[in-house]
Amino acid sequence: MKRNRFFLSLLFMVLIVLFVILFFTWLGRENIKNDSAIREVAKEEVDKLFSLYNKGEYAEIYDLSCDSFKNATARKDFLTVMETKMKILGEFKGRKLQYSNVINSKSVELYYRVGYINYSLIEEFNYIKN
């Protein structure tokens, strides 16, 4: 009798643990599904930046950046860096998303393998929803 009670208790504990695992797995997947919208917005913003880069509209890129970036980087310095980047790397050719991460459903980190005419590199983009 004690043995049966032990096995029933053990079975009950295992079922509770499985339920908890399944619940948190489901919860995590729901959050990932909900994050797809902000990921797409972030990707669209990166596409916009690459388009502006190829057109040489660096001031537009600066204007799209967040306030903390503008506080840390003078407009003139940014424009100089971007002009130098174009001279060294060349025009943007293409990119492939390597990794993305959503933080608190408001911030997205995107890591791309980016191809330019002269070089290929990994670039990180951070999108913060206002």
Each predicted region: which residue ranges?
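Secondary-structure boundary/capping signal
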Residues: 69, 73, 90-93, 120
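A short, amphipathic edge element
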Residues: 79-107
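Exposed beta-sheet edge and beta->alpha loop/turn motif
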Residues: 99-130
